[in-house]
């Protein structure tokens, strides 16, 4: 199976650590977050990975070479001319997914014990265009889903902005966990190679294509792109 890791971010929230290293190589209990994500993907059956790079890209490439690419095929998608956001970054790497099989998209700063094999099985059972790992937790932004767990909107709590394609039915708000399963068909509906958000694409497609929720409320989940969460994750893995 194939996967993509979003690893191009500048890690602004983790400064001053990221003044000298890329966010992807920030360590959690002595192990770089990139290594933790790669190893989780391998344990879930992934044997081919592409990751996008930008900030201190050479550090990441050197790290992968020093670790013999963890024994699998790992390709690099360079965003040297500027970050392309989630949608643009994914679209630039679309050549990697020409086999027309579902793949995992995973943020480098997300650590969890989510069962990716079950998520893939769920995605295939629902014949979804994309499946989003979501969680009941406090957030400033939520995806909105109907009672069939199908995406129907989005809400920004801070600004009050709401997009709701299903206004007359009961909806549930769930926070995104930074992990997707995607069918390559989605590239047919994406803009050209430009900067854009995959969230907007999901919302635009959700009325005509199944974009599904995969709730995972048990176990651990950390967004370690934030200093407090990084500290908490260090303590958790130190005691594990």
Regions found by a protein language model. Name each.
Residues 1-19, 44:
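N-terminal nucleotide-binding beta1-loop-alpha1 segment
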Residues 3, 25, 76-77, 130, ...:
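Generic preference for hydrophobic
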Residues 144-146:
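Short beta-strand-to-turn element immediately C-terminal to the catalytic PLP-Schiff-base lysine
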Residues 20-33:
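Short catalytic helix/loop segments, enriched in acidic residues and glycine
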Residues 126-136:
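A short, conserved acidic/glycine-rich loop-to-beta-strand motif
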């Amino acid at each position: 199976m194939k996967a993509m890791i979003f690893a191009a971010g500048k890690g602004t929230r983790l400064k001053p650590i990221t003044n000298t290293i890329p966010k992807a190589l920030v360590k959690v209990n002595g192990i770089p977050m990139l290594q933790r994500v790669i190893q989780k993907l391998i344990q879930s059956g992934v044997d081919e990975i592409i990751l996008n790079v930008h900030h201190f890209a050479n550090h990441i490439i050197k790290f992968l070479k020093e670790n013999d690419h963890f024994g699998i095929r790992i390709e690099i998608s360079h965003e040297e001319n500027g970050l392309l956001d989630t949608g643009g970054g994914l679209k630039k790497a679309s050549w990697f997914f020409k086999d027309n099989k579902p793949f995992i998209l995973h943020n480098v700063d997300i650590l969890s014990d989510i069962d990716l094999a079950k998520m893939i099985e769920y995605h295939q059972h629902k014949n979804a265009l994309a499946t989003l790992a979501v969680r009941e937790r406090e957030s400033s932004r939520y995806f909105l889903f109907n009672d069939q767990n199908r995406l129907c909107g989005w809400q920004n709590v801070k600004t009050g902005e709401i997009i709701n394609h299903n206004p007359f039915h009961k909806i549930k708000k769930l926070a995104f966990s930074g992990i997707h399963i995607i069918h390559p068909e989605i590239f047919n509906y994406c803009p050209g190679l430009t900067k854009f958000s995959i969230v907007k694409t999901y919302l635009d497609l959700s009325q005509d294509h199944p974009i599904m929720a995969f709730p995972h409320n048990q176990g651990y989940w950390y967004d370690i792109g934030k200093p407090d969460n990084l500290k908490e994750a260090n303590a958790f893995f130190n005691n594990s």
